[in-house]
């Protein structure tokens, strides 16, 4: 019994070490790439009052994916909070869809972003698979809007894969509510599989 407890504690520590490393890499890359995209496309300096909306997936009564030890809604909020801190230190004005463990309706998220007149919308998620074999990072955008959505998705995805050496699941199109109903370039990033042993 005691041996099993020690094994579980060691596994929990490995999980948290990996997640912290992944969080750090993804957060830094997200912040840098979002900033670069905004400066390039909107011809502004980093000191302009520019709204970037970060959407930490799930929250409150909607936990998202989990592997028993780690819950998606907690990971996405951690990534979003750290990304916000880096961007704000660089002079950007950042808005969060949620700042704590609260539930926000899916249809309300793009409404919040549009109300803020944001320049970029980034929705952050973690993936899962029933068989535990799914792995890698994938990024989504919608074709219903302009080319800026695709360019933002491709830039963020390319650099995250390059720096993390994670399995590349590609840049894909999807008509998710938060992508279609936002009025600014928007992407949804699946940052890794909580159900895959080496990614969690």
Give, region by region, the residue ranges found by the protein language model.
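Catalytic cores of nucleophile-dependent amide-cleaving enzymes
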Residues: 160-164, 174-177
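N-terminal Lys/Arg-rich, disordered targeting/topogenic segments
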Residues: 1-18
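Hydrophobic membrane-insertion alpha-helices, especially the h-region
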Residues: 20-37
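Conserved beta-strand segments of alpha/beta enzyme cores
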Residues: 93-95, 138, 167-170, 185
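Catalytic-core regions of hydrolytic enzymes
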Residues: 38-154, 162
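Fold-independent oxyanion-binding glycine-rich loops
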Residues: 28, 56, 191
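Active-site-adjacent mobile loop/cap segments within catalytic or ligand-binding domains
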Residues: 123-131, 170-200
């Amino acid at each position: 019994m005691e041996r099993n407890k020690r094994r579980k504690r060691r596994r929990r520590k490995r999980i948290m070490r990996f997640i912290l490393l992944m969080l750090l890499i993804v957060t830094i890359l997200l912040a840098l790439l979002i900033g670069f995209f905004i400066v390039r496309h909107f011809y502004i300096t980093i000191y302009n009052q520019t709204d970037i909306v970060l959407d930490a997936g799930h929250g409150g009564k909607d936990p998202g994916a989990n592997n028993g030890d780690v819950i998606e809604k907690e990971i996405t909020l951690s990534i979003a909070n750290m990304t916000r801190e880096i961007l704000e230190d660089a002079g950007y004005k950042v808005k969060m869809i949620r700042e704590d463990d609260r539930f926000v309706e899916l249809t309300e998220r793009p409404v919040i972003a549009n109300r803020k007149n944001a320049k970029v919308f980034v929705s952050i998620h973690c993936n899962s698979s029933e068989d535990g074999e799914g792995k890698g990072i994938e990024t989504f955008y919608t074709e219903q809007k302009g080319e800026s959505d695709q360019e933002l998705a491709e830039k963020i995805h390319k650099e995250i894969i390059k720096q993390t050496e994670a399995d590349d699941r590609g840049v894909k199109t999807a008509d998710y509510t938060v992508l279609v109903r936002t009025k600014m370039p928007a992407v949804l990033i699946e940052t890794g599989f909580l159900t895959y042993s080496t990614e969690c």
